UniProtKB/Swiss-Prot annotation:
This is Peptidyl-tRNA hydrolase. Keywords: Cytoplasm, Hydrolase, RNA-binding, tRNA-binding. GO terms for molecular function: peptidyl-tRNA hydrolase activity; tRNA binding. GO terms for cellular component: cytoplasm. The gene is pth.
């Protein structure tokens, strides 16, 4: 069981300008916003197949990782980082998009399956375990018509947020940062409760 002492915060996404600000890259967006807040830059680390940055949350130092693999190969970077930094599986937190959650909804969970997400699926395969923490960030479903949902999934996740959606996501990512601070200051239970609560008018 995790104590909330996350040494590695990893966001999932696809590398390259083609995928910048797409729904599937909201995990990257969370880390980029956190790095911007802390005025730090990412640098490529070829040994872990990803871009890394160092930040401080409260009095504690943390590492941010954006895999330079494509989404479906995220596990290669995550597993390499765990070995390189000599971490335990309960010391990592994965930020990932979830189209089964309404836009703006957050869901923190320790353990569980991939939920059909190929990035999580690859991480589970490489680690040989699903007992890691993940923060799912809701991007909303592609269509209310479930009959053509599968057909619209790829265009949806690789599409960009519109102006109204972007405003919601900005508030959500600010809430993610606040949630990490709550975890550092008050512990995982209170932090999880904060993250899983609905957005309010005062958020962001």
């Amino acid at each position: 069981m995790s104590s909330g002492n996350f040494q590695l915060l990893a966001g999932l996404g696809n590398p390259g300008s083609k995928y910048t600000s797409t729904r599937h890259n909201v995990g990257f967006m969370a880390l980029e916003r956190l790095a911007k807040k802390e005025s730090v830059q990412f640098a490529m680390n070829k040994k872990i197949f990803g871009h890394i940055a160092n930040i401080e949350i409260g009095a504690n130092k943390r590492k941010l990782l954006m895999p330079n693999t494509y989404m479906n190969e995220s596990g290669r970077s995550i597993s390499a980082a765990i070995k390189w930094f000599d971490l335990e599986i309960n010391q990592i937190l994965i930020f990932v998009d979830d189209m089964d959650l309404p836009l703006g909804k957050l869901r923190f969970r320790e353990g569980g399956g991939s939920g059909g997400h190929n990035g999580l699926k690859d991480i589970i395969k490489h680690l040989g375990s699903q007992d890691f923490c993940r923060l799912r960030i809701g991007i909303g479903p592609p269509s209310i018509n479930q009959g053509d949902r599968k057909q619209k999934t790829i265009p949806h996740v690789l599409g960009k947020f519109d102006q109204a959606e972007s405003k919601v996501i900005t508030k959500v990512l600010d809430k993610v940062i606040k949630g990490l601070e709550v975890i550092e200051q008050y512990g995982l239970v209170k932090g999880t409760s904060f993250l899983n609560s609905s957005l309010t008018a005062t958020d962001g």
